[in-house]
Amino acid sequence: MQARWVGGFTMKIDGNRKQDRATELVLTYYSAFNRGDWDGMLALLADDVVHDLNQGARETGREAFATFLARMHASYREQLRDIVVLASLDGDRAAAEYVVHGEYHGSDEGLPPATGQTYVLPGGAFFEIHDDRIARVTNYYNLQDWIAQVGG
């Protein structure tokens, strides 16, 4: 257990608060992403997870999320760094900010051709959490910045 003196009171971070568990859940999700552990990511999702794609459609369900991960794996190799997670006190919502370091190795439909271009791009995500599972993931990044970096 960690205890810190903050603003005149001691703050305890021991993993027992819902806020702590939400933060840990999101960090575990991103750790699995960075390892390429798609099964590990899927295990953290609710069966009816809602996934809002950046500037795209809303997809629902773990199977749709698995299909998304397979498509991403075919076109991109990415690592998220400098991850910061904030969670609501009740643990029902969380937000993350990160920097994507990636390589575009397989052309993705509607985007410029892939030739192994690299990119560094800030991004963020919002989460809803129900019953210690991720029920919604909404991702944001600047698509125009990414296109400029890969030469589109």
Give the ranges of each region predicted by the language model.
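C-terminal and inter-domain tail/linker signature
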Residues: 3-152
